[in-house]
Design a protein with these regions (language model features):
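ABC family nucleotide-binding domain
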Residues: 1-167
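Conserved beta-strand-loop-alpha-helix hinge in the C-terminal portion
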Residues: 170-186
Length: 186
């Protein structure tokens, strides 16, 4: 996830993002790529504890230079998509684990990234909320967003169009073998 998200650079091989080798990008360019192109959903949420859910969602928009009025509107729309617009003013300590995860997901998608990286996005969610998140990811993917989900949950992985198994940093299997259930039906 760190290499795909441009947090770390590869020590071997070449990672090409938007037609450019990432290792050739200067730090300022990498920052711009992370800010404008990639949305991150971290396993441990990474929410700012003293800020409201809405303020946490709007954080990437501050760095992108979006006006306060537009930030609020975009943040509320993102919270609405994850079913938490009624919790916009709540601090993280007032939210359940599943609600915190959905705030983190809203923050990851608020800047309309081309690439969404999600580390165990359903791990803290009940089955209903987890299903809603996966449906949201599917909707984002259908609209052109590349969604990469890192998971140990086979049922979550089976919803993917493509599955890559990685063990100790090495790709061991790749393809649709565990496959998309919709593909299996056809």
């Amino acid at each position: 996830m760190n290499i795909v998200g441009c947090l770390d650079l590869p020590t071997s091989g070449t990672y090409i993002l938007d037609g450019r080798p990432v290792s050739e990008l200067k730090e300022k360019e990498l920052t711009r790529v992370r800010r404008d192109t990639i949305g991150f959903v971290f396993q441990n949420f990474q929410l700012m504890p003293r800020e409201s859910a809405l303020d946490n969602v709007c954080l990437p928009l501050i760095y992108a230079g979006v006006s306060k009025k537009d930030r609020r509107q975009m943040g509320m729309e993102a919270l609405e998509r994850v079913g938490l617009s009624d919790r916009a003013d709540f601090k993280p300590t007032q939210l359940s684990g599943g609600q915190k995860q959905r705030v983190a997901i809203a923050r990851a998608m608020v800047n309309h990234p081309k690439l969404l990286l999600a580390d165990e996005p359903t791990g803290a969610l009940d089955s209903k909320s987890g299903k809603q998140v996966l449906e949201l990811f599917e909707s984002l993917n259908e609209s052109g967003v590349t969604v990469v989900v890192i998971t140990h949950d086979r049922k979550v992985a089976e919803q993917a169009k493509r599955i890559v198994h990685i063990i100790d940093g090495e790709i061991t299997e790749e393809g649709q073998e565990a496959g998309n259930e919709k593909e299996k039906e056809n």
